[in-house]
Amino acid sequence: MNYDKLMRKCFNLAKKGHTSPNPMVGCVVLDESGNIISQGYHKKYGENHAERDALLKLKNGEERNGTLIVNLEPCNHYGKTPPCSDLIVERGIKKVIISNKDPNPVASGGIQKLENAGIAVVTGVLEDEGKKLNEVFFTNIIKDRPFIVLKTASTLDGKISTKNGDSKWITSDKARDCAHKLRKKYDCILTSSSTVLADNPQMKHYKKNCIHEFVRFDAGIVQPKNYVSLCRSRWNSMWFFLKRRFG
C-alpha cells in the first residue's frame, strides 16, 4: 500500500479548507480491500473535522475493517464537534495512518484511544511535509506566538519608488498574485501609516469567507478622512497603534 501517495492526497484535500485557528486536515477512507470509498476535509472552523466529513458520507458500513488516512492525529475532545476518535472506533476502522501527532494538549490523545480500542496506528508518514502544511498551527501551539510572513517589494538597487512618487508598480503580475494569496491565507494584515497615506491600499483578497483583522502602525494620527470608513467595509476588525506626542 502506497501510504505516501494517499497522504499527499490528504494534504491536497486539506488545502481546500480555510480553517484558522484550526489546522488544515484531509482524510481518505479505504475499504477492507484497499479501495478508496470516501474522502473529506475540514472546510471551516466550527464545521465537521476531516474524519467526520469522510465517515458520515458512508451509510452502509463499507468502512468496517478498513483503513483511514489522515494528516493529523484525530481529536479526542468535545469542542465544536464530538471527538473524531470516538467515531473512528464506532465505525469499525482497523487501521489509521497519520502524518503528524497533534501538539495541542487540549485535542491530543486520539492515538492512545484508538490503540486502546485495538486499532493499529501508524504515525510519521511524510511527517515533515505535514508540518510544513500546518506550519502556522504548529507555531501557534508549540511556540505560543503568531506565524509571521514579511511581504516587501523593492527594486534591484533597494528602492521602493521613484523620488517623485509617480511610479505605480515595481512588482510583476506574478508577485502581486503572490501577495493576494498571502492575504487570503493569513488572518491579519499589518501595514504602516506611510503606506496608507501614499497608496491608500485596498488590501483585497479573492477568497470568500475569509475573516481578517487589519492592523496599522502610525507615526502620527494623520489619515485620509474616508480611510476608516473604507476599512470598516473591508475588514472584520481594525487595530490602530498610535504614537503619542508629548511636549
Can you name each region flagged by the protein language model?
Residues 21-24, 147-148:
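Short, small/polar residue-rich loop motifs at catalytic or cofactor-binding pockets
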Residues 2-20, 140:
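Short, basic/aromatic recognition patches
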Residues 71, 184-185, 246:
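Alpha-helix C-terminal capping/helix-to-coil transition sites in glycosyltransferase folds
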Residues 29-129, 239-242:
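Zn2+-dependent cytidine deaminase-like catalytic core
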Residues 139-140, 145, 149-152, 156-230, ...:
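Active-site ligand-binding patch in enzyme domains
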Residues 94, 227-229, 247:
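Short acidic/polar active-site loop segments enriched in Thr and Asp
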Residues 10, 26, 75, 114, ...:
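Residue-level signal for inorganic ion chemistry
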Residues 27-28, 151:
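Generic short beta-strand
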